[in-house]
Swiss-Prot record:
GO terms for biological process: intracellular monoatomic cation homeostasis; response to cation stress. The chain crosses the membrane at residues 18-38, 133-153, 180-200, 212-232, 243-263, 270-290, 413-433, 443-463, 475-495, 498-518, 552-572, 586-606, 619-639. This is Cation/calcium exchanger 3. It is found in: Vacuole membrane; Endosome membrane. Belongs to the Ca(2+):cation antiporter (CaCA) (TC 2.A.19) family. Cation/calcium exchanger (CCX) subfamily. It holds the Pfam family Na_Ca_ex. It is a multi-pass membrane protein. The lineage of its organism: Eukaryota, Viridiplantae, Streptophyta, Embryophyta, Tracheophyta. GO terms for cellular component: cytoplasmic vesicle membrane; endomembrane system; endosome membrane; vacuolar membrane; vacuole. GO terms for molecular function: antiporter activity; manganese ion transmembrane transporter activity; monoatomic cation transmembrane transporter activity; potassium ion transmembrane transporter activity; sodium ion transmembrane transporter activity. Endomembrane-localized H(+)-dependent K(+) and Na(+) transporter. May have a function associated with the pollen vacuole during tube elongation and polarized top growth.
Amino acid sequence: MSAVSFLYSSKTPKFRGVFNGICALVLFCFFFDRSELLRNPLLRNASFVNGGSGSTSGGITQFMVIRRNARQIETNGSGNNSSLSSSSTVLCSGLHKHMGYADQCEFLKANPICSPDGFFDYLSFFYCSCRDFSILGYMMLGVWLVALFYLLGNTAADYFCCSLEKLSKLLRLPPTVAGVTLLPLGNGAPDVFASIAAFVGTDKGEVGLNSVLGGAVFVTSVVVGIVSLCVADKEVKIDKNCFIRDLSFFLFSLVSLLVILMVGRVTVRIAIAFVSIYVVYAFLVAANVILRKHAKRFKLEALTPLLPMQGSVFSPSVGEDMPMNTPLIETETEDGPPRLQSLPQWMWASNVAIYSNHFAKVSVHDEDRPPWGWIDDTAEVESSSCTKFTSLLEIPLTIPRRLTIPSVEEDTWSKTYAVASVSLAPVLLASLWSSQDDVSLQACGVAYFFSVVIGSTLGFLAYKNTEPDHPPRRFLIPWVLGGFIMSIVWFYMIANELVALLVTFGEIYGINPSILALTVLAWGNSMGDLVSNIALTMNGGDGVQIALSGCYAGPMFNTLVGLGMSMLFGAWSKSPDTYMLPEDKSLFYTLGFLVLGLVWAMVILPRNDMQPSRTLGVGLIAIYLIFVTFRLSCAMGFIPWAA
């Protein structure tokens, strides 16, 4: 906990400031490298001007024409996407030897299809701009990789989860419904949108599959294993009904995914059916709470819900006497019906709170205190020149999002930013739509015109109907929905860059991007789960139940909703044809180890009277180490039959 307190307490803002400053410097270098295109954004659509000839002095038009033609070939039919992928892979495999070319830079200029689909051309930056400074190139790409992980988590913690919390209150959703719908979406947003970006944005479905499944193996093995070791000497019991229910649904979802992977193709109906598994799970959890609420009337004993709906999630005979949280659903009183309360604020960003600037700066009252104890309720950010300087370093990473994501949070309210965000958000949407390869210059002009008109209108209305000292009290739903939608847009943009950068590292090191997704991307997106769940466990009491429930319900949500929505969007883009899933034999091994970890927990915990033990923890960690060793050995060719 000392390390967590050091990094995320309000007394140590220097670390974040220096980190943001370094990331901003790297971002400036990327923009400078892309300066020619930024000076004339219409170059990205220049292929329509030259009719596909692709002959300009700068060479950028030729780059776009080749990339566009490749995508046209891909969209001609679903049966061609695998052949195109394999042909481009064979073509780009000669990057390191660059036979017939002076160096890798000349190879990339002649074969621009090898560059990943991102806003920045990382391969050209590394091999051309950093041609004589490879160490500097490695360092800058590495820093930017960490920055993208941070931006993904920070967007979830400080923007997306806040919108979900407000939306839940405005819609008056019961805590049970919010706990199985909006809450896991907030905590699992980085995994979900990274998967969607891999399927749709960069057409690297194998990266999305390996990222989600690799993260699931990590959380259900390493995180559960460490949690078990932390409480092995304590008298802690896990609710058996809740545990069996979660693992049963998770195993069923993995079997369903296995069938889909074996078929190798997916339609819109199949993708919807896969996502519907989570809908059924959420319905059962909500129904359990309703039955529990009326247990005396129906004489039934309901299952424990995923999240603590009462002061304690344990059975009455087990657990702490003092509840950790205020009850979310109060029992009936003589004065009237039960009073509905909302979920505690800390729950909405529990798995991504380590990325939050908001939690590091804002003090909270005792009733809203997160159980991991990262915040001192009397702590305040020191107003010093050093703090102000580090705040300036954060501007390049924070200002673009604040200028385009509407926010109505009391602590961070600014009328200037509010007016700017509703004015610039339509322009950002138009820019993203215009960046597609099949959009004409005329369509781009029309999109920008309407975006400016809509943005100006919204900005004028926001200016006239808001106050400088507090957020708007009326018409909150449009504000919250705007923040929700623009957070998703930023998720997609950041996740798309993250996947493109991982593909770049795969090209540079000669490593299959699937391995990087299985390890680097999975570990990066799972750091929040690791830190928050261990902190909850060390807090004791109900925290152990919440941590273990999250270790299974979270990966299940990412698998069903993250991969399900990714396959749905992919199938929708190929409709009425079927979407061909990537042929990756290693996915079956990943599923096998994931099922092995779940079965191990399902066998050991009941035999030990539902008490986490060292046997459970050591066994799960050993399973993960064997899994990683096996996958890396396959990738390096040490196990030919499994490659």
